[in-house]
Amino acid sequence: QAEMMMQFMQGGLDMATFWPLFWDSEFGFRSFFDKKTGKLQPTSEIMKIFGTFQGNELIEYTASPAPEKIPSLAVRDAATGKMALCLLNKNDFTVEAAVGGRLAARKKRVEVEQFRMSADRMSLEHAPVCKAKAGSVSLAPFSLTFIYL
């Protein structure tokens, strides 16, 4: 869902419809929440996360590895000037990502926030925002990482 939301935003679509992907049985109802824990399903979490970025200005940047290997998106909030880079690691191994262009030139230190898929693939684990050196960041396996400038 994260990659699809990024593609929607890159294409200029500022709103998307939600459909849950997980259900409790073959003929069960797909829910927005896990009935046992009351937590949002991963798909619901992704929609909630990206909802804060929809409608923002897309900005140009360079990133390594290439977007085909690590889908990414950079946005700027016109009201606050705050920029965010989103990187999606769909691999089962850690990836070192380098950021360049307007994003890298802006600050020496950045804030990094990461959401990691749990081992059972049923929930997103949130790593709190932390400070990091600008230019490079480690992307955990199966994670969605935001770099804020």
Over which residues does each language-model region extend?
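Aromatic/acidic polysaccharide-binding cleft in carbohydrate-active enzymes
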Residues: 1-73
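A general structural signal for short secondary-structure junctions and capping/turn motifs
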Residues: 6-10, 75-77, 102-104, 136-139
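Active-site proximal loops enriched in glycine and acidic residues that flank catalytic Cys/His/Asp
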Residues: 17-21, 62-63, 87-89, 99-101, ...
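Surface-exposed, flexible loop/turn segments at secondary-structure boundaries
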Residues: 24, 93, 120
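Carbohydrate-binding surface patches
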Residues: 67-106
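Solvent-exposed beta-hairpin/edge-strand motifs
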Residues: 102-122
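Short linear proline/tyrosine/threonine-rich motifs used for host-factor recruitment
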Residues: 124-126
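C-terminal beta-strand-rich structural cap/linker in extracellular carbohydrate-active enzymes
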Residues: 128-149
